[in-house]
Amino acid sequence: MHPEKLQAYVLSTLDYGDSDRIVALFTLEHGRIKAFARRARNSRRRFGAALEIFARIEAHVEIKQGGLSGLRQAEIDCIYPGIRGDLGRIAYALYACELVDAMTPEGHPLPRLFRLLAAYLDRLEAYPASEQERRFFEINLLNILGYRPSLEACSRCGTPFDDRGALLLDDGELVCRACTGHGRDMTQVTLGRMLACLKTGTFGLIHFPDEAQAQTGSALDRALAFHAGHRLKSLEFLRQISNENQ
């Protein structure tokens, strides 16, 4: 079997034995896959620095359905030196990769999400990291995967949200006040900004006022925790870095 040449991002790596490595890749052609890289820790000719987390690479992979594929060789397309030189940007890039790793099915192509991750890492390479752009990435990821909260109407009864906005429940669900009397307020301004994020593919165009940013963060944190099913390790690192920079 001849290896396929795939466009890929390195999502995670796991050392195996004395010299091998298991690599999670997010590819344009096959979505998320896991591949076994034999002697990856010893062979700089075949891999070099290409297996660093969030590196964009050309991966030579023998695809195996229902098991570990074989990573034969990898060349770097972009190592993102600007991100790697800044601890804050590293934290956001690691979080984005772990989120994709946790949220996506294996072996299912997701070209829109591949382009979203590419755009986010390109943005982090060129500009300082920000919470607003993290939220832009998150809501578009949820939308692509079919998990985003209903922003126009109550998820229970279907009634369009009025000027009072919505109420946010613990699982990230947004409902009207006729369906529940409990929950965190989500104003129409917040809902409108979240919807605006879905109407442009460009980072840096949508600005969240402080209240809207806080409400958006609460909604996305709850939705992501619910759908990911476990706590992301990189999220703790991201929060630590964010607190130190305040």
Swiss-Prot record:
An individual GO BP term: double-strand break repair
Domain of life: Bacteria
GO terms for cellular component: bacterial nucleoid
Pfam families according to UniProt: RecO_C (PF02565), RecO_N (PF11967)
Alphabetical list of SUPFAM superfamilies matching this protein: ArfGap/RecO-like zinc finger, Nucleic acid-binding proteins
InterPro entries, sorted: ARFGAP/RecO, DNA_rep/recomb_RecO_N, NA-bd_OB-fold, RecO, RecO_C
Protein keywords: DNA damage, DNA recombination, DNA repair
Family annotation (PANTHER family): DNA REPAIR PROTEIN RECO
Family according to the record: Belongs to the RecO family.
Function comment: Involved in DNA repair and RecF pathway recombination.
NCBIfam families referenced in this protein's UniProt entry, alphabetically: reco
Protein's name according to its UniProt entry: DNA repair protein RecO
Organism of origin: Pelobacter propionicus (strain DSM 2379 / NBRC 103807 / OttBd1)
Gene: recO
